């Protein structure tokens, strides 16, 4: 049955506007799979980028799933980050080869607003497409966390200009 927005309007306009904006943002993000590449020695940068979105997704009634290789999330960190402790689920010590499959299954269920998984290798186009399709089906967001070591980055010559001066010779 269709009813107009006017007939269903609420007397508290700001709340209705806020809810509509939140729903629009959540729907726009659904089906999104994004890779976050960060330096292992600077994990806080990735957290600073993701926490606002994770807080917003935490307002949904669904879970947030963290598939972590070794680290265990501390209750204190989850609470101090503003994430809903009662909606955060973690599976730790997951073998890297199982992370992709677990992400696809979790995204597809629709039980999670966001699924975050750590990958050591880059995904193929086919693997990425499978994640995107699962996120669309489950109306969820997926984040692939990809740590890189500073010494693993390809070495290149620094761009710069060497200025010789006969004043110093």
From Swiss-Prot:
Is rapidly cleaved and degraded by the Lon protease once DNA damage is repaired. Residues 162-169 are annotated as: Lon protease binding. The keyword DNA damage applies. Induction: By DNA damage, as part of the SOS response. The record marks 169 as: Essential for degradation by Lon protease. Keywords: Cell cycle, Cell division, DNA damage, Septation, SOS response. Transmembrane segments: none annotated. Pfam families: SulA (PF03846). Residues 106-112 are annotated as: FtsZ binding. One of its GO terms (biological process) is division septum assembly. Component of the SOS system and an inhibitor of cell division. Accumulation of SulA causes rapid cessation of cell division and the appearance of long, non-septate filaments. In the presence of GTP, binds a polymerization-competent form of FtsZ in a 1:1 ratio, thus inhibiting FtsZ polymerization and therefore preventing it from participating in the assembly of the Z ring. This mechanism prevents the premature segregation of damaged DNA to daughter cells during cell division. Belongs to the SulA family. Interacts with FtsZ. NCBIfam families: PRK10595.1, SOS_SulA_coli. This is Cell division inhibitor SulA. It comes from Salmonella paratyphi C (strain RKS4594). The lineage of its organism: Bacteria, Pseudomonadati, Pseudomonadota, Gammaproteobacteria, Enterobacterales. The gene is sulA.
């Amino acid at each position: 049955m269709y009813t107009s927005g006017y007939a269903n309007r609420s007397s508290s306009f700001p709340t209705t506007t806020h809810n509509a904006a939140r729903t629009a943002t959540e729907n726009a993000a659904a089906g999104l799979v994004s890779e976050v590449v960060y330096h292992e020695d600077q994990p806080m940068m990735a957290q600073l980028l993701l926490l606002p979105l994770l807080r917003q997704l935490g307002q949904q009634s669904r879970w947030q799933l963290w598939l972590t290789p070794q680290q265990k999330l501390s209750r204190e960190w989850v609470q101090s980050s503003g994430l809903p402790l009662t909606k955060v689920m973690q599976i730790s010590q997951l073998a890297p080869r199982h992370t992709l499959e677990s992400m696809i299954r979790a995204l597809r269920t629709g039980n999670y607003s966001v699924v975050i998984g750590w990958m050591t290798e880059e995904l193929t186009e086919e693997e990425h497409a499978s994640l995107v399709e699962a996120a669309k089906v489950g109306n969820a967001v997926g984040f692939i966390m990809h740590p890189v070591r500073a010494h693993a980055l390809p070495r290149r010559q620094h761009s710069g200009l060497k200025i010789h001066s006969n004043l110093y010779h």
